[in-house]
Amino acid sequence: MMEAKNIMENRLFNMMGSEVVSGFSCKPVKLVPDKPIMHFKTHIFICGDERCGGAHKNENIAADLRDVLKEINLANGETRIKISRTGCFGACRFRSVANIYENTKTNGFEANNNIWLRNIHKYTKEKWIELFTALAQNKSIDDLDFKQVPMSEPSTYK
C-alpha cells in the first residue's frame, strides 16, 4: 500500500501529498479530479477474484508486493512499479494470473507490455524480486523463466 506519512495532529498524508481518510493508507479526504496520478514505469495487475485469489492463500498479496517494492526501492521514482488487484481476467485455468502493463508513453519497455503471467501463486519473494528487477532494467521477460499465459492468434476467430 502507498505509505502514509504521519504529520502533526495524527493526520496522515499519502505520497502525493493529500490528506488521507482515517482508517485508510492512501484514500484522499478530498478528491481533486484534475490531479494527475503518480508516475509509474510498469503496472502489474494481479487477479484477486475467487479462483486466482484462492490460489494465493494470501489476501494481502498486493500489499505484500508493494512492501517488497519499497524494500528494493522500486515503489517510486522513474522506475516505479505499481501493483493493483483486479477482478477476473477470464484466464482462471492458468491461475493465478497477473498482467504486465508498461507505460510506453514515457519510459516503459514495449517488449514487456501486455505479458500475462501464470501460476504467480507459486512465486517466492526472490522470484518476485527477480521479476521486478528485470522490469526495472528493461530486460525482456521472454528471455527469463516466467511462465506466460498462451495467446491464440487473431486469425483463430475469423
Indicate where each model-derived feature is located.
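Short flanking/linker segments adjacent to small metal-binding domains or redox-active Cys/His motifs
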Residues: 94-158
